[in-house]
Design a protein with these regions (language model features):
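Acidic (Asp/Glu) and glycine-rich low-complexity loops/linkers
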Residues: 18-42, 47-128, 134-146, 152-164, ...
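Eukaryotic tandem repeat interaction scaffolds
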Residues: 175-222
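General secondary-structure propensity
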Residues: 7, 223-224
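Beta-strand-rich extracellular passenger or scaffold domains
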Residues: 133, 205-207, 224-227, 283
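Bacterial N-terminal signal peptides
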Residues: 5-16
């Protein structure tokens, strides 16, 4: 390379490094409520976190971050400031919607992370195209969906529904039914006092109950480990196409083989129905 060309290339690289710094701005709002909140949250990119705080108010903190496209930095900063000055927060009674930016162009090359503190009695609906979702300590119900990213829900007093196209799902300490689906990722649903319906195309499944209730588990590629409620009775149906089955002492009422088991645990009870295509089944 000629000296002049080398100088020009080095100068451009230096400008690129300096100019590619991210722009970050925030918006905040506190909404006072007389009663539980119903939240409807969405973000294209950035993720969502909801935690329980004291009653009577919802505290919203949004973080707007630019991408690293040098040639669009001025335009991106202008759009970030538009969102910052008019944050996407709507209220109708105790229903609060956050993240619904009606002019979709404003979010191009911008991520928006939502961090929200709510009264413990709240229910939550959350949607993310790219980014994880975490909900902790609310009454519920909780309904989460993400196209790319994991989902975590803990200490929920009622139903949890979690769906991820790509990402793991971790649910713990739920006092109600749990419904979980992921195309690619593992599933943990532990300490559940309600029914469980879990399915993954690629990944393992771990389930445990504190109260006997129906369990349905499906995994195309990955094993399943289930811990049943202590001293409770269940009806059991388990099958693996490639793997082995380990079950507690039970009364056989149908097939019993290394890859298929059907019978009653203790005196019988809610149905445990487990099928995996490739992997082991371990029921405790």
């Amino acid at each position: 390379m000629k000296p002049l060309a080398m100088i020009a290339a080095a100068a451009w690289a230096s400008v690129g490094i300096c100019g590619a710094q991210q722009i970050e701005r925030t918006f905040e709002r506190t909404i006072n409520l007389a009663g539980p909140a119903s939240l409807d949250l969405t973000t294209d990119s950035g993720g969502i976190a909801v935690t329980a705080g004291s009653g009577g108010s919802v505290r919203i903190h949004g973080i707007l971050t630019s991408g690293r496209r040098l040639w669009r930095s001025a335009d991106v900063e202008s759009r970030i400031r538009q969102i910052e000055s008019n944050p996407p927060i709507e209220q109708s009674g105790n229903t609060i919607r956050v993240g619904y930016v009606h002019d979709r162009h404003l979010l191009q090359d911008i991520s928006m992370r939502l961090e929200i503190v709510v009264p413990p009695e709240s229910q939550v609906r959350a949607r993310a195209d790219s980014g994880g979702i975490r909900v902790e300590g609310v009454r519920g119900p909780v309904d989460c969906k993400t196209d790319s990213g994991g989902i975590e829900a803990r200490h929920i007093e009622s139903e949890v529904r979690a769906v991820a196209d790509s990402g793991g799902i971790h649910v713990r300490d739920v006092k109600g039914p749990v419904y979980v689906r992921t195309d690619s990722g593992g599933i943990d649903a532990l300490e559940i006092a309600g029914s469980i319906d879990a399915q993954t195309d690629s990944g393992g499944i771990r389930l445990s109950q504190t109260v006997a209730a129906p369990i349905r588990a499906r995994a195309d590629s990955g094993g399943a480990t289930l811990t049943l409620a202590s001293a409770a009775g269940y009806d059991l149906r388990a099958r693996t196409d490639s793997g082995r089955i380990a079950v507690p002492e039970m009364t056989v009422s149908g097939n019993l083989s290394p890859r298929q088991a059907e019978g009653r645990v203790r005196a019988g009870g809610p149905l445990v129905d487990v099928q995996v295509s490739s992997g082991n089944i371990d029921i405790r």
